[in-house]
């Protein structure tokens, strides 16, 4: 059932984004005041001939974060989906969905939250004990600013996607930024605030 729902979600996303590229040079701004952020492309690998895999490092809240993008091999600018993983996951979370979008002509920028991965070898800096929904909101704001400025991105077609805790973070962030074309949330953890209150009553 989960795969069926994912397939339906991807189909809806494809319909919403469209895959027509554009050569426009507009920029996307966020209302958030974020720290100075840097980007560095350090790897570029061809995959399947349908897309290029690019890896990035950028800074958020004083932590170095790892990001990976699937960029379609097409001319001009393309729609962009910025993906936020769930608690304890990483950029490979829902990877098949990311690849399917890239093969359909939609770029996907996925990053690892600071302290948000339970991997024994996390790609981003930060401790789990230092991570919260609010720190992840800031991470996503910085990711939006970085990704929206990429040369292959159509700034009028930037979408946010998140799953589980990443879905909650995506929804909260969308309330504070501008020029986001749409949201796609997979089983968002909207119950998390109530769960925490019930676990730690006053």
Model-found features: residue ranges?
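Active-site glycine-rich loops that stabilize anionic/oxyanionic intermediates
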Residues: 78, 84-89
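C-terminal motif of bacterial Sec signal peptides marking the signal peptidase cleavage site
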Residues: 15-16
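The serine-hydrolase catalytic nucleophile loop
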Residues: 88-99, 113
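Conserved alpha/beta-hydrolase
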Residues: 101-122
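Alpha/beta-hydrolase active-site loop
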Residues: 129-151
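Alpha/beta-hydrolase fold nucleophile elbow
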Residues: 152-163
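Hydrolase active-site cap/lid region
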Residues: 172-202
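N-terminal cap/lid segment of alpha/beta-hydrolase-fold proteins
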Residues: 36-74
């Amino acid at each position: 059932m989960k795969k069926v729902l994912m397939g339906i979600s991807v189909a809806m996303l494809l319909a919403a984004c469209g895959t027509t590229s554009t050569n426009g040079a507009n920029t996307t701004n966020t209302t958030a005041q974020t720290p100075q952020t840097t980007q560095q492309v350090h790897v570029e690998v061809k995959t399947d001939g349908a897309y290029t895999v690019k890896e990035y490092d950028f800074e958020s809240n004083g932590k170095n974060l790892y990001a990976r993008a699937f960029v379609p091999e097409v001319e001009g600018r393309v729609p962009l989906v910025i993906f936020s993983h769930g608690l304890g996951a990483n950029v490979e979370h829902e990877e098949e969905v990311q690849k399917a979008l890239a093969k359909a002509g939609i770029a996907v920028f996925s990053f690892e939250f600071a302290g948000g991965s339970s991997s024994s070898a996390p790609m981003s800096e930060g401790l789990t004990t230092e991570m919260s929904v609010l720190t992840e909101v800031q991470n996503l704001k910085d990711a939006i600013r970085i990704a929206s400025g990429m040369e292959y991105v159509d700034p009028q077609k930037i979408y946010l996607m998140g799953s589980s805790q990443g879905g909650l973070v995506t929804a909260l962030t969308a309330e504070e930024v501008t020029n986001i074309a749409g949201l796609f949330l997979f089983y968002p953890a909207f119950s998390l605030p109530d769960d925490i209150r019930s676990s730690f009553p006053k």
